[in-house]
């Protein structure tokens, strides 16, 4: 069950990959691992946002311990800790996570400005896409299967080297 991440501390990557494949086949739609900046599905956007929160915190841990192997770290991020609750009540937990990652943001902003800028730009885009949905009654309803696709795509986007557009140069 992908909503219960804590049950798979050593095998999360495999569970995630299998879940993505099963959901892809079950829903018969084309899901690409590439980030879809046009997707305005509530679950997809909340998945992307959770990935941003997790990446910000992970970068802070990397700054603190640059020589420590990621796999050795037993540190649980707030995104991991609140995963189950977030998938059940995303809008409520989003505000909680925003407050919890503030100290991590400051450290990343000071020590890895480029990474901070990339994550902050992505977050601003997601929040802008979520803004029209925030007034709806169903904003805090449990997330559907598209959540995991948004989460995965955002993380893949972060770890993939991006070519600069002429407008960015």
Label every model-predicted segment:
Residues 1-169:
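Intrinsic-disorder/low-complexity detector
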């Amino acid at each position: 069950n992908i909503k219960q991440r804590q049950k798979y501390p050593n095998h999360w990557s495999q569970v995630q990959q299998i879940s993505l494949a099963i959901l892809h086949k079950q829903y018969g739609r084309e899901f690409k691992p590439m980030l879809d900046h046009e997707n305005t599905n509530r679950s997809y956007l909340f998945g992307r946002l959770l990935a941003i929160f997790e990446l910000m915190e992970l970068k802070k841990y990397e700054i603190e311990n640059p020589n420590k192997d990621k796999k050795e770290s037993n540190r649980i991020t707030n995104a991991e800790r609140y995963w189950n609750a977030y998938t059940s009540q995303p809008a409520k937990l989003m505000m909680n996570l925003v407050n919890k990652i503030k100290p991590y943001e400051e450290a990343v902003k000071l020590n890895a400005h480029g990474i901070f800028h990339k994550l902050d730009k992505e977050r601003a885009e997601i929040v802008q896409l979520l803004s029209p949905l925030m007034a709806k009654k169903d904003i805090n309803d449990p997330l559907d299967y598209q959540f995991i696709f948004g989460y995965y795509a955002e993380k893949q986007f972060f770890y993939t080297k991006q070519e600069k557009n002429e407008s960015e140069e």
